[in-house]
UniProtKB/Swiss-Prot annotation:
Belongs to the class-V pyridoxal-phosphate-dependent aminotransferase family. InterPro entries: Aminotrans_V_dom (IPR000192), PyrdxlP-dep_Trfase (IPR015424), PyrdxlP-dep_Trfase_major (IPR015421), PyrdxlP-dep_Trfase_small (IPR015422), SP_NH2Trfase/AEP_transaminase (IPR024169). One of its GO terms (molecular function) is L-serine-pyruvate transaminase activity. SUPFAM superfamilies: PLP-dependent transferases. The gene is agxt. Its cofactor is pyridoxal 5'-phosphate. This is Serine--pyruvate aminotransferase. GO terms for cellular component: peroxisome. Substrate binds at R376. Gene3D superfamilies: Aspartate Aminotransferase, domain 1, Type I PLP-dependent aspartate aminotransferase-like (Major domain). It catalyses: L-serine + pyruvate = 3-hydroxypyruvate + L-alanine; glyoxylate + L-alanine = glycine + pyruvate.
């Protein structure tokens, strides 16, 4: 058995094009966030690393607008955070209602059925959101222990109404799990005020960070559910009973109490090697958020979206979601992601290719039921600014004219 050069690929230094990423994610990295990817590597038991962990958890509480002690980053993309919620909160015999009105709310359902519960899918046409009456009807009829929904649906650009949903879940003794991957950091989210029990996001969208690490928060009620399961969490890597021992060993998941001892004296229990430089970059993204102020960040995303709507109208284009509804708790357009109807007779793929080839601008097409019907334009994180929108509208005008659309 000899040494082989069969797969010894001859390569040069990696050189990637510089794109303006105005699709559904990722967004462009903020330079300060990017710089943290080459910060010094330290061991995962180093005191300086523990300090980064603690600061990041506190900054995430600001992001989520929560006092939840169990607020940690998951090692993995947003889908890993989704599966953390599903695998920890569902066990055999549990009845779960999944509200499905888009690609990613359906992904939650597809994931949930693998964990042995009685999973009930409540469908609504893509591009719509669930009214409070519909949600209450599902809770009354099915009596679930968990309700899942997506607040900002990446596939449709729809913002789900949140007003009153948490109160209904408490009324019917049901935990509430909310996907905020395309929304958190771009539009207002109030985990505590909205009585959300499990919430998560990704770093690569409205935080302008690299993918691969995902903020997550659990209420004390969710933690109690996890700690008092009748069966072990079926996913060892994402088991929050184990993850808590590393991130927050001072916290008792079962009763929500915090140990009285000095935190530094409570040993962390190793679980897995966390992606250190991704954690540094997440921390820096959150520091930037604090420096600008959440209210200012939200307003910047809203102002950018409204400027985009005006630009689209000037080209004769229409957002797919007609309702604006600026109040954060109301259903309507998601300011961080806009779906745009592709005009009749226009080749949507050719327009996207023209933007990419001639202007290095990336927007995306629809997925699932919306494939070939819409473009998806993301104004996320640092990319939500007037200069990018003016450049996009000007470039899009050229792309449309080349493809025979009179604008």
């Amino acid at each position: 058995m000899g040494y082989s050069d069969k797969h010894k690929l001859k390569t040069s230094n990696l050189q990637l094009p510089v794109r303006l990423l105005l699709g559904p994610g990722p967004s462009n990295l903020h330079p300060r966030v990017n710089q943290q990817l080459i910060s010094s590597m330290v061991g995962y038991t180093d005191a300086s690393y523990y300090k980064v962990m603690d600061e990041t958890m506190e900054l995430m509480r600001y992001l989520f607008q929560t006092d939840n002690h169990f607020t940690i980053p998951i090692s993995g993309a947003g889908t890993a955070a989704m599966e953390t919620c599903v695998s920890n909160l569902i066990e055999p015999g549990d009845k779960v209602v999944c509200l499905v009105s888009g690609f990613f709310s359906d992904r939650i359902y597809q994931m949930a059925v693998r964990y042995g519960g009685n999973i009930l899918k409540v469908d609504k046409q893509w591009g719509q959101w669930f009214a409070l009456e519909e949600i209450e009807s599902a809770l009354v009829q099915h009596k679930p222990s968990l309700l899942t929904l997506v607040f900002g649906e990446t596939s449709t650009g729809v913002k789900q109404q949140m007003e009153g949903v948490g109160e209904l879940c408490k009324k019917y003794n049901c935990l509430l799990m909310v996907d905020c991957v395309a929304a958190l950091g771009g539009v207002p989210v109030f985990v505590d005020d909205w009585k959300i029990d499990a919430c998560y996001t990704g770093t690569q969208k409205c935080l302008s960070g690299p993918p691969g690490i995902s903020p997550l928060t659990f209420s004390n009620a969710a933690c109690h559910k996890i700690a008092t399961r009748k069966t072990p969490v079926a996913n060892w890597y994402l088991d929050c009973n184990l993850l808590g021992g590393y991130w927050c060993p001072e916290f008792n998941l079962a009763d929500g109490t915090i140990a009285k001892e000095e935190k530094s004296t409570i040993p962390k229990r190793y679980h897995h090697t966390t992606p250190a430089n991704l954690l540094y970059s997440l921390r820096e993204a959150l520091v930037l958020l604090v420096e600008e102020g959440l209210d200012n960040v939200w307003k910047r995303h809203q102002d950018a979206a409204i400027l985009l709507y005006a630009g689209l109208e000037s080209l004769g284009l229409k957002p797919f979601v007609p309702q604006l509804n600026e109040a954060p708790e109301k259903g309507g357009r998601l300011f961080s992601l806009t779906t745009v109807n592709i005009p009749d007779g226009v080749d949507g793929k050719m327009v996207m290719k023209y933007l990419l080839d001639n202007f290095n601008i990336e927007i995306a097409g629809g997925i699932g039921a919306f494939a070939g019907k819409v473009w998806r334009i993301g104004l996320m994180g640092q990319n939500a600014n007037p200069g990018n929108i003016k450049l996009l509208i000007s470039s899009l005008s050229d792309a449309l004219k080349v493809n025979g659309f009179n604008c």
